[in-house]
From Swiss-Prot:
The keyword Cytoplasm applies. It is an enzyme of class 4 (lyase). It comes from the Bacteria. It comes from Deinococcus radiodurans (strain ATCC 13939 / DSM 20539 / JCM 16871 / CCUG 27074 / LMG 4051 / NBRC 15346 / NCIMB 9279 / VKM B-1422 / R1). The record marks 333 as: Important for catalytic activity. GO terms for cellular component: cytoplasm. This is Fumarate hydratase class II. Homotetramer. The active site is at 190 (proton donor/acceptor), 320. Pfam families: FumaraseC_C, Lyase_1. One of its GO terms (molecular function) is fumarate hydratase activity.
Length: 464
């Protein structure tokens, strides 16, 4: 039988597993919200952010004379363990709880309180010498702490995970674009043949999309540096020292290296999460760029004998349980599925962000979960696509030449010399009779052989 201890809150007593640091409110949440427990338990980013939040709050309160130094020191030591990931198993709650994140805020308060009590040699559950509300939550409300943790978590994940992962893929593609900048191939619009481009130009388009999308994410991320801390329950700062918000934000900057600041308008910081909505929208843009790239790659690699086949990609695993020897563009397929998930997450965030009522938005947990999932999926997908696909992209030069030689849209180069109508007649004749453009042009007498050779130069048509 599991050994228990009694914990109390304002609603009474609760039996808690004696090996766990959480208290009565967390235990109630475990019983009241058994929703997606195997899938939607908070991960490292939010738990770490809660630790950073509580550590900085204790330091700020101590400097302002709101907490005894010895109590603050105990809180800081316990919070450091939360930040380091040593207490993750003591954060059992799921995303789907109260929309302000109150249960998760109290989970952090209770865990830090009991661990601090243990460090002091006290009795867990006694709330002495460190009380979860009076000390760990001093000058705070769930309404300002949880959105603060949301922003801290997302900023850290963007900087420590996403930017590097996307940048790695971007750099690989940029190198490929430079490598193949003079390799001329068929361009395509409307899924039909178009005028020539180089393979480098095609890949360079993907690079430019990633550059733009990443710049948009970084711009949106700047808004996440504004924190709700100091607003307490409704944005007025009731029960917090007037300097608490600014000082706490400074402590978060010292802990993380990112320039966090207490938001100028706390009412908006509690009741709306526009910076998170904007960040999600930018992630959606990034996912769209990755979707386009992945689709282009699998189309260009289609075949091997009856598709476009202008590039080859690494053969990573068997592609069929019934067709021997078949190999599929699996990294592209994984990337496109990630993109659709990010699109769905953004729809969740956009709707949830619009649902603030009066002084509070109560969709906070699902918003930050969706954004963090998008960041993680995009990051992992970019690394996988880079390592198992992009680095191995190679041109199939024979197929590229074959397709280019058959491309009727090279006739566009004749427009300025013989006019659109005559050029169109050449293309139609060549297509109808299955001949080359050159043969059709000479047969119609619109150009000489020397003129055709001078005017129809594929590389020159790329303006490379």
């Amino acid at each position: 039988m599991t050994k228990t201890r009694q914990e109390t809150d304002t609603m009474g007593k609760m039996d808690v597993d004696a090996s766990r640091y959480w208290g009565a409110q967390t235990e109630r949440s475990i019983h009241n919200f058994p929703i997606g427990r195997d899938t939607f338990v908070w991960g490292r980013p939010v738990i770490r952010a809660l630790g950073i939040l509580k550590k900085g709050a204790a330091q700020a309160n101590a400097e302002l004379g709101e907490l005894p130094a010895d109590v603050a020191d105990l809180i800081v030591k316990a919070a450091d363990e939360v930040i380091a990931g040593k207490l993750d198993e003591h954060f059992p709650l799921v995303v789907f709880q109260t929309g302000s994140g109150t249960q998760s805020n109290m989970n952090a308060n209770e865990v830090i309180s009991n661990r601090a009590i243990e460090l002091a040699g006290g009795e867990m559950g006694s709330k002495k010498p460190v009380h979860p509300n009076d000390h760990v939550n001093r000058g705070q409300s769930s309404n300002d702490t949880f959105p603060t943790a949301m922003h801290i978590a997302v900023v850290l994940e963007l900087n420590e995970r996403l930017y590097g992962a996307v940048g790695k893929l971007r750099d690989t593609l940029h190198a490929k674009a430079e490598q193949y900048k003079d390799l001329v191939k068929v361009g395509r619009t409307h899924l039909q043949d178009a005028t020539p481009i180089t393979l480098g130009q095609e890949i360079g388009g993907w690079v430019a999309q990633l550059d733009y999308a990443l710049s948009e994410v970084k711009h949106a991320g700047e808004g996440l540096l504004d924190l709700a801390i100091g607003g307490t329950a409704v944005g007025t700062g009731l029960n917090a020292h007037p300097k608490f918000g600014d000082l706490a934000a400074k402590k978060y900057e010292e802990e993380t290296g990112y320039h966090f600041r207490s938001a100028e308008n706390k009412f908006a910081a509690l009741s709306a999460h526009d910076a998170l909505v904007q960040t999600s929208a930018a992630l959606r843009t990034l996912a769209g760029a990755l979707m386009k790239m992945a689709n282009d790659v699998r189309w260009l690699a289609s075949g091997p004998r009856n598709g476009i086949g202008e590039i080859t990609i690494p053969e990573n695993e068997p592609g069929s349980s019934i067709m021997p020897g078949k190999v599929n563009p699996t990294q592209s397929e994984a990337m496109t599925m990630v993109a659709t998930r990010v699109f769905g997450n953004d729809a969740t965030v956009a709707f949830a962000g619009s649902q603030g009522n009066f002084q509070l938005n109560v969709f906070k947990p699902v918003m930050v979960h969706a954004v963090l999932e998008s960041i993680r999926l995009i990051s992992d997908a970019c690394l996988a696509f880079n390592d198992h696909c992009a680095v191995g992209i190679q041109p199939n030069e024979a197929k590229i030449k074959e397709n280019l030689d058959k491309n009727l849209m090279q006739v566009t180069a004749l427009n300025r010399h013989i006019g659109y109508d005559k050029a169109a007649a050449i293309a139609k004749k060549a297509h109808k009779e299955g001949t080359s453009l050159k043969d059709a042009a000479l047969a119609l007498g619109y150009v000489t052989e020397d003129e055709f050779a001078q005017w129809v130069v594929p590389l020159g048509m790329t303006h490379n």
